[in-house]
Regions:
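A late C-terminal transmembrane helix in Major Facilitator Superfamily
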Residues: 94-128
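Residue-level signature of mid-helix packing/kink "hotspots" within the transmembrane helices
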Residues: 22-30, 114-115
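Small-residue hotspots at the loop-to-helix junctions and early N-terminal turns
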Residues: 11-19, 104
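Short amphipathic helix-loop junctions that connect adjacent transmembrane helices
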Residues: 1-12
Length: 156
């Protein structure tokens, strides 16, 4: 809905854009896994959060440009999935692969977080319009960076 509201002319291309978003999810997760193997899960999670924030800023700045908006949304989705594997990797490393229960709880909480985020998005969109969703996403990305900085200092 966000892209269609900004650029109604892209409606015939939405199925291709959605395929691109799906490929971005897969690619982001794949690249994130390789980066996590190279630099460690904590640093790669921070990198993913910084990339997410940068992509949101670029979406905000280049909002009037149709194709740059689509490109940066694809980049944002890649960076969002960049951290997909790192949470489970971190739990597995900390518990020395002994806690399938914690991995299961983590998966459930990720689903709960997605449901909470979708509900929050619905409230924000109803109160102030779909354009404001970019600001909410930017604020949550910044909050994620702050939480990770505090966590990295507390648990080096």
């Amino acid at each position: 809905p966000y892209l269609l509201l900004l650029f109604p002319s892209i409606e015939p291309l939405m199925s291709l854009i959605l395929v691109g978003l799906g490929l971005a999810s897969f690619t982001g997760n794949l690249i994130g896994g390789h980066v996590s193997d190279a630099i460690g899960y904590a640093k790669s999670m921070m990198l993913g959060a910084v990339l997410q924030t940068a992509a949101m800023l670029l979406i905000l700045v280049f909002q009037p440009s149709k194709w740059l908006s689509v490109l940066f949304i694809i980049g944002w989705l890649m960076s969002a999935w960049f951290t997909g594997l790192q949470l489970n990797t971190g739990i597995a490393q900390v518990t020395e692969n002994k806690s399938s229960f914690m991995l299961s709880i983590n998966g459930s909480l990720i689903q709960l977080g997605g449901a909470f985020g979708a509900s929050l998005a619905a409230v924000v969109i109803n109160l102030s319009g779909i354009h404001s969703i970019v600001f909410v996403t930017l604020l949550t990305s910044l909050a994620l960076i702050l939480i990770q900085v505090v966590s990295m200092r507390k648990y080096p």
